[in-house]
Amino acid sequence: MARSTSKDAQALIQSLRSAYAATPSNLKIIDLYVVFAVFTALIQVVYMAIVGSFPFNAFLSGLLSCIGTAVLAVCLRIQVNKENKEFKDLAPERAFADFVLCNLVLHLVIMNFLG
């Protein structure tokens, strides 16, 4: 039974790899940006666990900045994806402008939180 589970897992990984190979390059760049933002948030959490969280506002601001940016990038990816039927009428330039404006608002709130 473990052998069939291993084969199923390998088949699943192979099918995911082949499906992702067909993804347009602009979506792959957004995916890379999301991975970078989440990785940066993880580094901040590990640093806080090792060193401590003396300026807790700074830690929360950095973490919320990374997570908020990743969420906004995922929203951008959903809107820019041509296969998504819900956002067919939305131009990619409009989606990017929304992303930039929301990022600006997010970071203004975070800077205000820092004090």
UniProtKB/Swiss-Prot annotation:
One of its GO terms (cellular component) is oligosaccharyltransferase complex. It holds the Pfam family DAD. It is found in: Endoplasmic reticulum membrane. GO terms for biological process: protein N-linked glycosylation. Pathway: Protein modification; protein glycosylation. The chain crosses the membrane at residues 32-52, 56-76, 95-115. It is a multi-pass membrane protein. InterPro entries: DAD/Ost2 (IPR003038). Residues 53-55 are lumenal. Keywords: Apoptosis, Endoplasmic reticulum, Membrane, Transmembrane, Transmembrane helix. Residues 1-31, 77-94 are cytoplasmic. It comes from the Eukaryota. The keyword Transmembrane helix applies. Belongs to the DAD/OST2 family. Component of the oligosaccharyltransferase (OST) complex. Subunit of the oligosaccharyl transferase (OST) complex that catalyzes the initial transfer of a defined glycan (Glc(3)Man(9)GlcNAc(2) in eukaryotes) from the lipid carrier dolichol-pyrophosphate to an asparagine residue within an Asn-X-Ser/Thr consensus motif in nascent polypeptide chains, the first step in protein N-glycosylation. N-glycosylation occurs cotranslationally and the complex associates with the Sec61 complex at the channel-forming translocon complex that mediates protein translocation across the endoplasmic reticulum (ER). All subunits are required for a maximal enzyme activity. This is Dolichyl-diphosphooligosaccharide--protein glycosyltransferase subunit DAD1. It comes from Betula pendula (European white birch).
